[in-house]
């Protein structure tokens, strides 16, 4: 469960013993004095500061997709016969990423070429959105293409 806590100085939220926290009470969570582990929001006030602690009430679905990615990588690593080749491929990928970032940085410093590449990028993004993302049958076609490419890469 995630939680966030903050301590704010008194002058930011209180003016002459009048609280500016009345708008918080209109929100759909409970506002209590003191710390209560069961409530999603706890507010405590002492003369010098206001402490606010917020806790998440549920789990996010992002953790399940992270576990799927980790399990997929573990399966590929376990099934591999040439682990040295996988390590070399990973290292080559990192070097290629580093080199391409340096190349892009060098091109970006040139005055006219970077503007031309931005125009090409905008035009390509517009075409891709119109071709694959605007209408439902085109989105389904893109989904099939991506699934086929992933299956080809993973050897399934």
From Swiss-Prot:
GO cellular component, one term: chloroplast
Ranges per topology, Stromal: 56-83, 131-156
Stored InterPro entries: CAAD_dom, CURT1
Location of this chain's protein in the cell: Plastid, Chloroplast thylakoid membrane
Subunit description: Homo- and heterodimers and trimers. Interacts with PSAD2.
Family: Belongs to the CURT family.
Protein name stated in the entry: Protein CURVATURE THYLAKOID 1C, chloroplastic
Gene: CURT1C
């Amino acid at each position: 469960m995630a939680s966030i806590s903050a301590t704010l100085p008194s002058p930011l939220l209180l003016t002459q013993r009048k609280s500016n926290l009345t708008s918080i009470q209109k929100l759909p969570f409970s506002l209590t004095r003191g710390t209560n582990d069961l409530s999603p929001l706890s507010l405590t006030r002492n003369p010098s500061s206001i402490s606010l602690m917020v806790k998440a009430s549920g789990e996010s679905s992002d953790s399940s997709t992270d576990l799927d990615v980790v399990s997929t990588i573990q399966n590929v690593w376990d099934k591999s016969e040439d682990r040295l080749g996988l390590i070399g491929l990973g290292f080559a990928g990192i070097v290629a990423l580093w080199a391409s970032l340096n190349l892009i940085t060098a091109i970006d410093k040139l005055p006219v070429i970077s503007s031309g590449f931005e125009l090409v990028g905008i035009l390509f993004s517009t075409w891709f959105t119109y071709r694959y993302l605007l209408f439902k049958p085109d989105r389904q076609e893109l989904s099939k293409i991506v699934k086929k490419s992933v299956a080809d890469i993973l050897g399934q």
